[in-house]
Amino acid sequence: MAALAPLPPLPAQFKSIQHHLRTAQEHDKRDPVVAYYCRLYAMQTGMKIDSKTPECRKFLSKLMDQLEALKKQLGDNEAITQEIVGCAHLENYALKMFLYADNEDRAGRFHKNMIKSFYTASLLIDVITVFGELTDENVKHRKYARWKATYIHNCLKNGETPQAGPVGIEEDNDVEENEDAGAASLPTQPTQPSSSSTYDPSNMPSGNYTGIQIPPGAHAPANTPAEVPHSTGVASNTIQPTPQTIPAIDPALFNTISQGDIRLTPEDFARAQKYCKYAGSALQYEDVSTAVQNLQKALKLLTTGRE
């Protein structure tokens, strides 16, 4: 992909989107679709923050130029031309990164790349809002991932051993008010990231969450979008591929509907189509478990009229 024109220095007003822009830059070659939507989120958020002052207008104008250039380069990519495909692509990518970090956490393998994966997953869930309101599950995953990144980072920084997996803790509303935490580590004019690029969440709020249901770590896909961890001084950073767990098929889904009174609404068809798109996107990452789950949801909706 051709290099994009550099952005001017980031205005102070846009501090809350600087990590989303860094994530975009890191994915320009790894996954241009993710890079595009990260910039789109930054553009939409920046417009809401300040679109009038000269420095902000200049920055947003250059960011718009990058978006247009990316859109032209991606051409007829369905993830760009069709929102439902783009949303599925982004959700599956964020979930894949979340599950990688969660799997490492549950296995007691604490390292900087795992911390970054948790935090990046939370940023990508922010980006999903360009398609509309987040699901309750995504909201919970975002909170949990952001808290986990903070908790593990602080433990390692203080020479303590983090507690693996979900822990029972109290809710802290400060996290909602500080979702741009850790931004101080990102330069106002982002540099081209290297393969060992990391982030510093030292200013991220400390908060605890309870009642959040996180998928079992064993379901983390073998192939993840995260980078290979680098040496961090913490023992056992080697990632071992995890066998995929394919959910059991509900036999009831194969029962023939004989009543003939199932009335599907246009919304039902749209939701079924969305699940099928999600499944297709998951298969691009060889994530069989997620693909099967979404196909089951579509089949149940089409055969029962219910989710």
Curated annotation (Swiss-Prot):
Q: Which residues carry this modification: N-acetylalanine?
A: A2
Segments for region (Interaction with IST1): 2-186
* GO cellular component terms attached to this protein's record: cytosol; endosome membrane; multivesicular body; nucleoplasm
Region Interaction with CHMP5, as annotated, extends over 2-75
Q: Where is the composition biased (Low complexity)?
A: 185-206
Record's compositionally biased regions (Acidic residues)? 169-180
The record ties this protein, via PANTHER family, to:
VACUOLAR PROTEIN SORTING-ASSOCIATED PROTEIN VTA1 HOMOLOG (PTHR46009:SF1)
Name of the protein this chain belongs to: Vacuolar protein sorting-associated protein VTA1 homolog
Mind giving the lineage of the organism this protein is from? Answer: Eukaryota, Metazoa, Chordata, Craniata, Vertebrata
